[in-house]
Amino acid sequence: MRPLPDQSAFEDKSELVSKKQKNEDENNENRSPETPRTPKVCPKTPTKTPLRTPTKNQAGVQFLTQKKRTKSCSSHFEYINQIGEGSFAKVYKARSFVDGRLYAVKKSKKPIWETSERNQHIQEIENGMKLGHHNNIAQVMCAWEEGGHIFIQMELCERGNLKDALNLAVQEEGGLGKLPEYMIWQYLCDIANGLSHVHEKGIMHLDIKPENLLFSNDGVLKIGDFGVCSTTTGGDDSEGDQIYMAPELLNDIHTPSADIFSLGITLYEMATNYNLPQKGQWWRNLREGKIPFPENDDSISQDLKDLIILMMNPDHTKRITIQSLLKYDKLQSVITLKRSTSTLYRLQRKLF
């Protein structure tokens, strides 16, 4: 087994403490913002330029520019409340008047006329189309444009995201202050399966982090938000949240291995529940293979520590691949258990 990393990497513990310790100080900071009033129907003003993207792909996902529609697509939805917000868009929970089902509808914060910004939204739509349906991917259903705003109708994952789960673990009375390890392995199984599908389609996500890992109604973890991702042949210079960013992206080296690092540091956060650094010496240490774990903490197995070290290897050419990750002994046993449990559940549904 590989030795544990140099514990002196984080000699000053003042900046690297558990979220449970800092929870009271950060209470106001972590509180969800008040939900603003949502628009009833988006304006129907004509767009300046129709988006140039396929109107339909093999998965059946459609994109409609205003010139191709006879009425506002937004009028097909009842907007219930805002459930998320990013740099470029807000996400609403909405009920379709067509089928009565609930969806997530993402709306750009402002009309998108600037080319690079439009291209980023188009990229998210096209990659969603390319990925199609997968159990561990938040599916894109449809997209359209109104008044310069871009809308994306997606599968609703209303049980929150992994960041929410980590915060709840901190607040749990008498708990570990973090997720139990058996749960971490189950979540890793979901994420790894989804990421394998993403890479098989020739796409790099480039923004794997807890906020972009969403829980479906049945508790399955799904990868969402493909607004930053790039194709493996595209030579794009996109990069996501620097807290989870792979070190080689600083040198404009874009490979699927960057997603493995981001997943590895996400796994590290899940296992330790440390507040990860955004910059400075601690940030650099984590990207130089100096990965400290809490001392005298037997809640983190050696299997999990070893895997995190493999995933966060500073050399992207030596980092474990998604194929090898799925074959990792411990993860294989979890995958087998999940499959057998799922099969048993389906049989019970048929019989009873």
Curated annotation (Swiss-Prot):
GO molecular function terms noted in the UniProt entry: ATP binding; metal ion binding; protein kinase activity; protein serine kinase activity; protein serine/threonine kinase activity; protein tyrosine kinase activity
Segments forming domain Protein kinase: 77-331
UniProt xrefs under InterPro entries: CC_SR_Kinase, Kinase-like_dom_sf, PKc_Wee1-like, Prot_kinase_dom, Protein_kinase_ATP_BS, Ser/Thr_kinase_AS
Region (Disordered): 1-57
Basic and acidic residues bias (residue ranges): 10-34
Residues given in the record as ATP binding sites: I83, G84, E85, G86, S87, F88, A89, K90, V91, K106
Annotated Pfam families: Pkinase
EC numbers, comma separated: 2.7.11.1
A GO BP entry: negative regulation of G2/MI transition of meiotic cell cycle
UniProt biased composition (Low complexity): 38-56
PROSITE patterns (UniProt xref): PROTEIN_KINASE_ATP, PROTEIN_KINASE_DOM, PROTEIN_KINASE_ST
Active site (catalytic residues): D207
The entry's keywords: ATP-binding, Kinase, Magnesium, Metal-binding, Nucleotide-binding, Serine/threonine-protein kinase, Transferase
GO CC list: cytoplasm; nucleus
Source organism superkingdom: Eukaryota
Residues given in the record as Mg(2+) binding sites: N212, D225
Enzyme class, UniProt record, top EC level: transferase
Catalyses which reaction(s): L-seryl-[protein] + ATP = O-phospho-L-seryl-[protein] + ADP + H(+); L-threonyl-[protein] + ATP = O-phospho-L-threonyl-[protein] + ADP + H(+)
Protein family per UniProt: Belongs to the protein kinase superfamily. Ser/Thr protein kinase family. WEE1 subfamily.
Protein name (Swiss-Prot/TrEMBL): Probable protein kinase DDB_G0291842
